[in-house]
Amino acid sequence: MLDLDHLRACILQRDEAALCREWLHPVEQEKLSSLRHQKRHLEWLGGRICVKEALRCFLKNSRHPAEVPAAHLQIIHAASGRPLVHQGVLNGDMVIPHISISHSGKYALAVAAAAPCGVDIQENRETLGRVQERFCSQVEGRLLMRFLPGLDSSEHLTLLWAAKESVKKAVLLESMPGFLELELRRIDLRHGPDHPGGLLFTFAFALGNQGKLSATTTHPAQFQALVCLDHGYGIALCLSSPSLFPGFHYA
């Protein structure tokens, strides 16, 4: 996870072009130069730095034959908008890692994994309450209040939004499921050194939308997101294979 304020300070202290040459593929440098809005420019750069670092960790732990410079890795996008790793300099025999990128407020976050994955970070904002009916059903609201009584409604919504976003990103369908097509069914506490203070949200496709899932046999009947609330941000990770939770790489 990268503090975008820190990134902004780094840009002010050194030549941004040099920073971009270190982290971005030439095609990505061209893309960044086209982003004129300062906030979008910073978020995009922060997301690319995060995902490159996550990829380098993944490749190192996958015994890739040589360390790959960040600038040699190129992130492209599928027609759906999903970020993908261009094979490029990667070993042709290895499975191309799956990636996911997110940013909100002052942070950017990314993950790389051997299976389809989704990551999301969401700042706790009052605007979520104004659009609550678009992503949180009454049943889900009651479930959150019942199992997380120590949190207020805005924190409930922040966690739910992040969790659903992570699941949407991890589901490999032609079109992402809608927020209300995913139903929160269960909340579990996660204990242990790998999940300090974490929560496990279990989702299922809403009744009547199961047909969307029948197009592929690679997805489980349920989806789980590891969720936490940290300094006013909801952070969520979904992997298509929950057994991979100990082995993912994020930055």
Predicted features along the sequence, with ranges:
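Core catalytic alpha/beta fold that binds nucleotide/phospho-ligands
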Residues: 1-251
